[in-house]
Amino acid sequence: MNTRRLFARSRLQLAFWYALVMGGILTLLGLGVYRAIVQANWMALEREVESIAGTLHDSLEPMLPSNASPTGVLQKMLPDLCLVNQPCQVNPTLIERHTLGISDRSLYYIRLFDYQGNLLAFSPNQPASLSSIFNQETWQTIHPPTGDRYRQFTTILHSAGNTDKSSWGYLQIGRSLAAFDAENKRILWILGLSFPIALGLVAFSSWGLAGLAMRPIYQSYQQQQQFTANAAHELRSPLASLLATVEAVLRIDSSHSPEINTMLHTVERQGRRLSQLITDLLLLSRLEQETTAEDWRLCCLNDLVSDLTEEFLELAIAAHIDLSSDLSSGEVYAWGNESQLYRLVSNLIANAIQYTTAGGRVDITLTSHEQMAIITVQDTGIGIAPDQQEHIFERFYRVNRDRSRKTGGTGLGLAIAQVITVKHRGSLTVESALGKGSLFTIQLPIFSVPIVHS
């Protein structure tokens, strides 16, 4: 995979997780702040209602006689309240004389009950659907079928002449929660508007911080790649000299003992293997560092596969393996670097022959489907275990290490193939089963060639 794309994806993932974590923290913090504000407003509202109820209680209790008719007393004490089962005329000064400085008197209503829980009087502005059945709970939240919610407080009233402090009745005062609910909605709206802005700032900051975090890693990776390329480049010359010397000694002086000749042949073989490894490392490093497509041109995949089949035919015959190819009836073109595409397919064919036993088959096919060129290399070889299939495209990974050493494999062939495929905006997949062989599939975008009519 292209190095820049790899690090860009890692940076994006790091920024995403950072933004996700910070977004979760901001969400929890916002919910906590909202909950704290709502709770504070709720407690302030209850204190206000309780304070007003206490003031009314202290004002009414001294004027409540123990033996007078409740109806007659209430008509004299509270002429602006509506009595049960009597006509009610709304007086504009109704609550103003009895709510003692309430800022918005229309938000409140008052109800009086006798000690048996029978409704005696009520404010004309109480909710129309409010039940007349007495509920002795101190605090209640009233939910009328229509309209606003109310918070209701109930307290006991005692008559002035009652020495045993038995109950004369009950006072209920309720407050509309319309303003409270509207304030909560306003807070939610502010938080809902602020959250995307904050999340956007967090995402922007996350991207910058992820870049700062990835910079030393990227620099370290570049230094490692540069070191690998430099080391491989510096090793090529002395290694070439060593191989030339060994070949010259073997060719000119044949008087050595069999042991020395064997050692020289071993040195030559290992030197060539090391030379191939250096070549592969340089190629892999160059592929990962390339960012331009200057050498790309139109490539006929039919010719490429046909040439490779002919090239590997002799090797397959020597290994007693049946090598065949089945090309698409029409010409299939791709846009890319021809030498790299050649290396891509040749690595797969070489691997297939290497891991197929004598008497087996290697089949190469070229087809096209939905603007994609599909090249498959299928063998009847030893196969790949499921737990190894996800690692075979890693550098220096070998399925069968002993066999790779005997055949001179470097462990970079499939890694190079994967890098070339991704560089050409394609995909490389494998399907395999132990003892049944493997199927490698390359998919590359098709380059449509315009048809010129003569």
UniProtKB/Swiss-Prot annotation:
Any GO molecular function: phosphorelay sensor kinase activity
Residue intervals annotated with topology Cytoplasmic: 35-186
InterPro entries in the cross-refs: HATPase_C_sf, His_kinase_dom, HisK_dim/P_dom, HisK_dim/P_sf, RppB, Sensor_HK_Regulatory, Sig_transdc_His_kin-like_C
SMART domains xrefs: HATPase_c (SM00387), HisKA (SM00388)
Keyword terms: Cell inner membrane, Cell membrane, Kinase, Membrane, Phosphoprotein, Transferase, Transmembrane, Transmembrane helix, Two-component regulatory system
Residues the record lists as Phosphohistidine modifications: H233
Enzyme class of the recorded protein, top EC level: transferase
Induction: Expression of the rrpa-rrpB (nrsR-nrsS) operon is induced 3-fold by Ni(2+) and less by Co(2+). Autoregulates its own expression.
Transmembrane segments: 14-34, 187-207
Name by which UniProt lists this protein: Sensor histidine kinase RppB
Organism: Synechocystis sp. (strain ATCC 27184 / PCC 6803 / Kazusa)
Gene: rppB
